[in-house]
Amino acid sequence: FETNVVIGKSTTIDQLIEDEGFEAVFIGSGAGLPKFMGIPGENANGVFSANEYLTRNNLMKAFDESYDTPIAAGTKVAVIGGGNVAMDAARTALRLGADVHIVYRRSEEELPARVEEVHHAKEEGVIFDLLTNPTEILVDDNGYVKGMKCVKMELGEPDASGRRRPVVVEGSEFEMELDTVIMSLGTSPNPLISSTTEGLEVNKWKCIVADEADGKTTKEGVYAGGDAVTGAATVILAMGAGKAGAKGIHEYLSKK
């Protein structure tokens, strides 16, 4: 095991092969990079990814002021997103004493969270602002969140996923008074490896393009699998991809 190495910074895939003598490399770096909306104000103090918010609260005990990793609990919190992780973040913030809103651009029928997760969130007192989409996070003079601009949405024709596409309702702009915004929009592969590896093809979601049967990528000697290829998925699929990649590498090295 070689720790404290960041592929793409400390070294690169090309260096592993050309300089360090590795004959094959398997990329299983996952899809842990939180997604953001790309709206103004996202860098303000008080904006968190759901991953960071939940990790700091649960693993680092940030809810306890005596610990070294405190986190401002917030009194008026908006969670952007509608998945199971969004429900976790909303219920955590609620239990820390905040008024919490789930902000989701589609209707309740399109919520990706499990029905029971939505039920429990409502039961605890989370407010659901559906058919609502943020356009800007408002920031005070000290760089802290003070609110959020939103627009109301309505459902139009189905998109490529089969769900009806949200369309902005003209003249529906409004503001929410907030001190914390939690982004729960899913995760994607970190592009650091792919952007520093010439000849390694990725798709439009920045996932590495690899053969499902053996993990082979577009770069000779480089194999990949798991969430780095599929996007965020399940452990069992990642395990299967690892086995397929091992088989592919064995066959590749056997022919050399």
Indicate residue ranges for each PLM-predicted region.
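FAD-site-proximal beta/loop scaffold in flavoenzymes
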Residues: 43-74, 158-232
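Rossmann-like NAD(P)H-binding beta-loop-alpha module
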Residues: 62-98
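Feature captures the FAD/FMN-dependent oxidoreductase FAD-binding
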Residues: 1-39, 136-149, 154-157, 180-182, ...
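Short acidic loop-to-helix transition motifs that present clustered carboxylates
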Residues: 6-11, 54-56, 108
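A conserved FAD-binding loop/helix module that cradles the flavin
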Residues: 225-256
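Cofactor-binding loop segments of dinucleotide-utilizing enzymes, especially the Rossmann-like FAD-
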Residues: 82, 105-107, 139, 227
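Rossmann-like dinucleotide-binding cores of NAD(P)H-dependent redox enzymes
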Residues: 1, 90-136
